[in-house]
Amino acid sequence: MGTSIGKLLEQVDGTLYKEYILERYKAGENGNSNFKDPTFNVPSPRFGKLDKPKQFEHAEFCSDLPSGHFCLDYLKNRKIPKEFYSQLLFTSHYKKFIDTLVPNHGKKLVDDARVIIPFYDVYNNLIAVSGRALETNDKTVRYITIRTTDSEDKLVFGMDRLNVHETVKVVEGPIDSLFLSNCVASGDANLTAVADNISAGKKVIIFDNEPRNKDIVKLMQESIKSNHQIVIWPDTIQAKDINEMIISGISPDEIESIISSNTVSGLEAQLKFNFWKKV
């Protein structure tokens, strides 16, 4: 025996049923009139993650590049873990790649060769791509990041790999984040904004090791005042960022240990910060 949409809503959700009756009343409908049941376009609930794109036009995954390719040489020189080659892309025509992926991006681009770093959200939706130039000069823009959606939310790299039940590390550079466990990257120096928007039990903010950079120093001071846990790099570390430390010969495990031993907050953070900064 069939039933009307109104009867069904009354049985399932009384609040929704009242809203439905009100909408009918506003439309001049009543119980004695003939009307067509409305169509509800309710999005399907999302269970788990989507599959990431398996191919892109005008680009190929670095894991598919032939041995000796100059892009692979770049990755090897940066000591990027091979496990991430299948997640990074190479294009010899960045403009063509972007024009196809995001036709109305509105940016003036050069059709040069770049390593492409895809940004995904927690559901594996592609939200942005960042192209790192492989051949640079004084006029080259090293990183060009393009959003693939209309969202104005802060871009964060690594959200697809994040486990909020473990300590979350926040760094600046996407490449830096590839060397640390459970790490995301802000793409800029405003790490605190990223940390504030991640719901995790414990978060550690890891600024670049630039004690003479006024902007970094200012942002670190703000993080300390907000009572965040941050890393104050020891004097024994001369490298500017995580990737430089790796290239200098420090292993990822050693860096993790250094981070753990130098994560501070509150008064201890302020005291160590005062000795660390050089401006």
Regions found by a protein language model. Give the residues of each.
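TOPRIM fold recognition
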Residues: 127, 139, 165-168, 174-279
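N-terminal compositionally biased, intrinsically disordered segments and leader/signal-like regions
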Residues: 4, 40, 146-150
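Generic detection of long, well-ordered alpha-helical segments
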Residues: 2, 61-68, 190, 210, ...
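Phosphate-handling DNA/RNA-contact segment within nucleic-acid enzymes
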Residues: 94-202, 216-217
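Short metal-binding segments enriched for Cys and/or His
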Residues: 1-13
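TOPRIM metal-binding catalytic domain and adjacent DNA-binding surface shared by DnaG-type primases
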Residues: 11-115, 123, 225, 260-279
